[in-house]
Regions:
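Catalytic loop of the DD-peptidase/beta-lactamase superfamily, centered on the K-T-G motif
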Residues: 2-69, 258-491
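Stable alpha-helical elements in mature extracytoplasmic
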Residues: 35, 39-43, 67, 93, ...
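Alpha-helix boundary/capping residues
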Residues: 46, 123, 139-142, 182, ...
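Active-site-proximal loop and beta-strand segments within enzyme catalytic domains
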Residues: 54, 62, 74-196, 210, ...
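Secretory-pathway/luminal and periplasmic proteins that interact with or process carbohydrate-rich
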Residues: 67, 123-130, 140-148, 215, ...
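Short, well-structured active-site flanking segments
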Residues: 84, 96, 103-121, 209-237, ...
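Catalytic-site signature segments of enzymes, centered on catalytic residues
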Residues: 85, 147-240, 253-256, 262-278
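Non-transmembrane alpha-helical segments in soluble domains
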Residues: 102, 117, 133-137, 203, ...
C-alpha cells in the first residue's frame, strides 16, 4: 500500500473519531421530574416519542384545582425544568391580546366593531377601516407579516439560517407604518387567514387608546388581576427572565430568543410559566378572567373550527377544545380548555417540536384525534440538508484533489468549503430523522480529501498562470461565501 494512501486512511479515521465527539446531539426529554408527581407521570406517558423534546412544563386544571409539573432539562447543562421555569409562549399571546379587546369592550372603552382608525388615529391608510374584531379574528385581510421589501425578506431568511431573531428592530412605529402602507385584501377580508400583523396592530391600537404601551396595558388589565407575576415581555436581551429555559431545535441546535416591541401582541417577546398560564386557564374556564368572553366562538374558520377574539375552538371527535398554540425559534406552547369537562391544560416546550398532541392527550382526546406533532418543515428538507451537506464537501474535495491542473488557492478554497459544508450540515440538518453517525463519516471523508490535496501542495503553483485574476476573484468570492456560511451557523 502506498504511503500516501496509508496517511490518508489514518487521517480519515482520526477525523472520523473526532467527529464522534463533535457530531450533532439530538434533543431528548430528560428523566428529571419536578412538581406534581402524578401529573408528571401522566405527561410523560402522553409523550409518545421523547426524541426531539428537551424539557416540558405542564399545568392541568380539574374542577378548579391547578396542578403543575416539570419534566426534563431547561438547558443543555441539565438544569431541571420546574413549574415556575419561564418559556417563550409565542402566539399564545394572541389569545391574551384578544382578551384585552374583550376586556376593553366590556369596560366601554372600545367596541369590537369600531374601525381601527377610530381607535388608533395615527393609522391613516386603507387599513384604518378594518374593525377591531376583524383584527382579533384574522379576518381583516392583512398579510401574515408587514410588507418590508426585499431587505426584510432577506433578514428573515438570514435569521432562519443563522437561528436568529427575525423580528429584531421592529417597534411600534414599524407596525403603525406597516398598517399605513398595507391595503387589506378584499377577497380575503371576512375569512380567517392567519396573520401576525393583525393582532400586533390590534394590541398597539388598544394601547394607544389607553395612552400606555402594550406591555403596560396587558399587565394592568390581565396579568396583575390574575396574579400572573412571572409573565413578562422581553423587549431586548436584558429583559430575559432569570432561570429561563433555553430553546433550540429538536435536532439539538441552540437558537436565539425572540424579543421586540412591534410584534409583542402577536407573540414576539412574551415569556410565561406553566403556573401563570394555569391561573389564566382556570380563571378563563370559571369566567372570572378579564376578557374571558374572547373565547366565545364567533366566526367560522372551517368545518371543524371557529374563532373568537384570538381563541380558536376546534372539535376533536367528542371533545370541543378552546385553544391557542405558539411557536418561536426554539420554543413551542399550547393552552387548551374543555368547558364540557371543566378541564384545561398548558404545555410548554423548549425545542421546536410541537406539544399540541401532548396537551390533547392530557385532556383525554383519543390518540387518533390528538394526532402527532407537525414538523417545522417537510421532513425531507431537513434530512436532505443533513445528508447533502455532510458529504458534498468531502466528495467535492476528493474530486479537486484528483484534478490534473490544480493550484494552491483552489485547494485552500475547496478545503474551507468542505468544512463549511460540515458546519452547515451540523446546524441546518434535521438529525432527529437522520442517523447522527453519518456526520463523522462526512468528517472523515472531508479529511481524506484534504489530505490527498495537501500531499500535492509542494508541487502546485500558487495560482493558475493562465488566468490568475479570474482564479483569484473566484476563489476570493468562494472563501467569502464559506466564511459567511460558517458565521451563519455558529453559536
Amino acid at each position: 500500500m502506498r504511503r500516501t494512501t496509508v496517511i490518508t486512511i489514518v487521517v480519515a479515521l482520526i477525523a472520523g473519531l473526532a467527529g464522534i465527539a463533535l457530531m450533532p446531539r439530538v434533543a431528548r426529554l430528560g428523566a428529571q421530574t419536578t412538581g406534581d408527581a402524578d401529573l408528571a407521570g401522566a405527561a410523560r406517558a402522553a409523550v409518545r416519542d421523547p426524541s426531539g423534546h428537551r424539557g416540558l412544563a405542564v399545568a392541568l386544571v380539574e374542577n378548579g384545582r391547578i396542578r403543575t409539573a416539570g419534566l426534563g432539562d431547561r438547558d443543555r447543562t441539565g438544569q431541571p425544568v420546574e413549574p415556575g421555569t419561564s418559556f417563550e409562549i409565542g402566539s399564545v399571546t394572541k389569545a391574551l391580546t384578544g382578551m384585552l379587546l374583550a376586556d376593553q369592550a366590556a369596560a366601554g372603552v372600545v367596541r369590537p366593531d369600531d374601525p381601527l382608525g377610530a381607535t388608533w388615529p395615527a393609522v391613516t391608510g386603507p387599513a384604518r377601516n378594518v374593525t377591531l374584531a376583524e383584527l382579533a379574528s384574522h379576518r381583516a385581510g392583512l398579510p401574515r407579516l408587514a410588507p418590508d421589501g426585499i431587505l426584510g425578506w432577506a433578514r428573515i431568511l438570514w435569521s432562519n439560517v443563522s437561528g436568529g431573531n427575525p423580528y429584531a428592530g421592529q417597534d411600534t412605529d414599524a407596525i403603525r407604518s406597516a398598517a399605513d402602507r398595507v391595503t387589506p385584501d378584499h377577497d380575503e377580508r371576512g375569512e380567517v387567514h392567519y396573520s401576525n400583523l393583525g393582532p400586533s396592530v390590534l394590541g398597539h391600537a388598544l394601547a394607544a387608546r389607553a395612552g400606555v404601551a402594550y406591555a403596560d396595558l396587558l399587565r394592568a388589565r390581565l396579568l396583575q388581576p390574575l396574579g400572573m407575576d412571572a409573565t413578562v415581555i422581553a423587549t431586548h436581551a436584558d429583559d430575559l427572565p432569570a432561570g429561563r429555559a433555553h430553546g433550540g431545535r429538536a435536532s439539538g441546535r441552540p437558537l436565539d430568543t425572540w424579543s421586540g416591541v412591534g410584534y409583542a401582541p402577536a407573540g414576539v417577546g412574551p415569556w410565561s410559566t406553566a403556573e401563570d398560564l394555569g391561573r389564566l386557564a382556570a380563571a378563563t374556564l370559571a369566567g372570572t378572567a378579564p376578557g374571558a368572553d374572547a373565547t366565545t366562538a364567533r366566526f367560522r374558520e372551517d368545518g371543524n373550527s371557529h374563532i373568537g377574539y384570538g381563541w380558536f375552538t376546534t372539535r376533536h371527535g367528542d371533545h370541543e377544545v378552546v385553544w391557542h398554540n405558539g411557536a418561536t425559534g426554539g420554543f413551542r406552547s399550547y393552552i387548551g380548555l374543555e368547558r364540557a369537562t371543566g378541564r384545561a391544560v398548558v404545555v410548554l416546550g423548549n425545542t421546536d417540536k410541537g406539544v399540541e398532541p401532548i396537551g390533547l392527550r392530557l385532556l383525554g382526546v383519543p390518540e387518533k384525534e390528538a394526532g402527532e406533532a407537525a414538523p417545522v418543515a417537510p421532513v425531507w428538507i431537513g434530512a436532505g440538508l443533513a445528508v447533502a451537506f455532510t458529504f458534498l464537501g468531502g466528495l467535492s474535495l476528493l474530486g479537486t484533489a484528483r484534478r490534473r491542473e490544480l493550484d494552491r488557492v483552489t485547494v485552500v478554497a475547496a478545503v474551507v468549503w468542505a468544512f463549511a459544508y460540515l458546519g452547515l450540515a451540523h446546524r441546518m440538518g434535521d438529525w432527529s430523522v437522520v442517523p447522527v453517525w453519518l456526520w463523522p463519516l462526512g468528517a472523515g471523508l472531508s479529511a481524506a480529501g484534504a489530505t490527498l490535496a495537501l500531499t500535492r501542495w509542494s508541487a502546485l503553483p500558487v495560482v493558475d498562470a493562465r488566468v490568475p485574476w479570474r482564479r483569484l476573484l473566484s476563489v476570493a468570492s468562494s472563501l467569502l461565501a464559506a466564511v459567511l456560511a460558517v458565521a451563519a451557523v455558529s453559536d
